């Protein structure tokens, strides 16, 4: 009877340890938000590039 209790205890410990993840997900969400803001600024500059070029050309023609 004691042998079956020991086996059950070892099995329960194994299941408990197997269900715990060794490397939890990092909680660096603030850095992801900062990175996303940087990407939005970069994309905005890329999209505004042709418009700025047209304005520069128009200003040069106006002189």
From Swiss-Prot:
Superkingdom per UniProt: Eukaryota
Hydrolase keyword on record: no
InterPro entries hit by this protein: Cecropin
Record-stated family: Belongs to the cecropin family.
Residue numbers covered by the propeptide annotation in the UniProt entry: 23-26
BP GO terms, sorted: antibacterial humoral response; defense response to Gram-positive bacterium; innate immune response
GO cellular component: extracellular region
Role according to the record: Has antibacterial activity.
Keywords assigned by UniProt, alphabetized: Amidation, Antibiotic, Antimicrobial, Immunity, Innate immunity, Secreted, Signal
Residues found modified as Leucine amide: 61
UniProt-recorded name of the protein: Hyphancin-3D
Organism the protein comes from: Hyphantria cunea (Fall webworm moth)
Signal peptide from the UniProt entry: 1-22
Localization in the cell: Secreted
């Amino acid at each position: 009877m004691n042998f079956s209790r020991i086996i059950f205890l070892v099995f329960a410990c194994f299941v408990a340890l197997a269900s715990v993840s060794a490397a939890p997900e990092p909680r660096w969400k603030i850095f992801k938000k900062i990175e996303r803001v940087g990407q939005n600024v970069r994309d905005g500059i890329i999209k505004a590039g042709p418009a700025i070029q047209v304005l520069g050309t128009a200003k040069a023609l106006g002189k």
